[in-house]
Amino acid sequence: MAELDIQISIEDIGWPGEETLLVFCERVLGAAAIYLRDNEKQPFPKMPPEVSLVFTDDASIQDINAEWRGKDKPTNVLSFPAFPVQRGKVPGPMLGDIIIARETVEREAQELEKSFDDHLTHLLVHGFLHLLGYDHMNNAEAETMEGLETRILAQLGLSDPYEGQDLKMEP
């Protein structure tokens, strides 16, 4: 497994305990880092880079989404890179923060007829890619990012989360 220094903060009592989340996130993000290193030639720093994960609720993520993106509504995941990074370049020692809202993950998982864990896995991978400079602001970026997500999730035994859907460009 690729080494990452994962820091976890739990702000909502509905999330599993810290140890459970840490093991889960180490497996998911470790697999993502290995896939990117081995298949996409993504370099990583010599020291394990730090990723901060905040597991929160809809109200908190709505406040953050309104402040930083001008969207006064909850969202599933937000990512904040610690430093500007270009895809394929060595990131800094701190990758940044990924914030995930439990109620939105639960609601979307139910709507998508997926398990909570499978949807959370997808959102962790999605947020991790944002920390490494990937985005989905246009068709080309969305195609690249969604393709990576699909291949990483396949390594984890999960199906294509975008199958039968249009590209998810950010408005």
UniProtKB/Swiss-Prot annotation:
It is an enzyme of class 3 (hydrolase). Zn(2+) binds at H126, H130, H136. InterPro entries: MetalPrtase_cat_dom_sf_prd (IPR023091), YbeY (IPR002036), YbeY_CS (IPR020549). Binds 1 zinc ion. It is found in: Cytoplasm. Its EC number is 3.1.-.-. Its main location: cytoplasm. Pfam families: YbeY. It comes from the Bacteria. GO terms for cellular component: cytoplasm. The keyword rRNA processing applies. SUPFAM superfamilies: Metalloproteases ('zincins'), catalytic domain (SSF55486). The keyword Chloroplast does not apply. Keywords: Cytoplasm, Endonuclease, Hydrolase, Metal-binding, Nuclease, Ribosome biogenesis, rRNA processing, Zinc. Its cofactor is Zn(2+). GO terms for biological process: rRNA processing. Single strand-specific metallo-endoribonuclease involved in late-stage 70S ribosome quality control and in maturation of the 3' terminus of the 16S rRNA. PANTHER family: ENDORIBONUCLEASE YBEY, CHLOROPLASTIC. Belongs to the endoribonuclease YbeY family. This is Endoribonuclease YbeY.
